[in-house]
């Protein structure tokens, strides 16, 4: 399956050896002993085939949380399994892949040249293959690049020695829990608000991202950042995805609920650990 199936299987593998409600494992965030599992990937996005994480939704309480356990023993990646995917699922998978990289890249400048270049390589690849993948999902070479990009985006390869963000993902998880939006679709909306609100904090990386990925080199720093954020949003638009909450009929009621959930849990995300309930509200308001 894809991320949802694999992640659910990871919870089953942990729950089989747990004496209690498997939801306890999710709330703890860490599994103990697990039954070994293998995966055959049929939807590329989450990297679950080569990482130890899993994200689980509980529909009756509208909650969505991550936990960590063992890696799959092995995974089979055959691009031909992607041939039957609807174009929207491909678009959401590409968005998820892209934002996975940004969560590890768009943080603190000057930490690792190698991590930056690896991350930029995946970003460039996704930008280049996205139109081809959406035009012809049966193009073996293109779907191979897509499948491997999604795996490498979240298999711990590009995070070595660098700070990470994940605020966009945590806010996106709440949107999925509350509105059943596909995960990648939530990221295509929230990432733009994150970059707008935290532009000063992310200034150095935004300038680097704009130059190296979007070719933005002219104008003042502020103008370059504006154009970079605009290019970022335009990319998700090119996938056919919404980039504003209002396009999905989401407004103040949801923003207030997400702010409340962040505050109630005491959650703080971002490379500076400054995305709390109030900051999550600002980010969401910037997505309206």
Give residue spans per PLM region.
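Short glycine-rich anion-binding loops that position phosphate/pyrophosphate groups of nucleotides
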Residues: 2-5, 43-45, 250
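A glycine/threonine-rich phosphate-anchoring loop and its flanking beta-alpha core
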Residues: 15-114, 208
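Active-site segments that bind and position negatively charged phosphate/pyrophosphate groups
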Residues: 104, 108-231
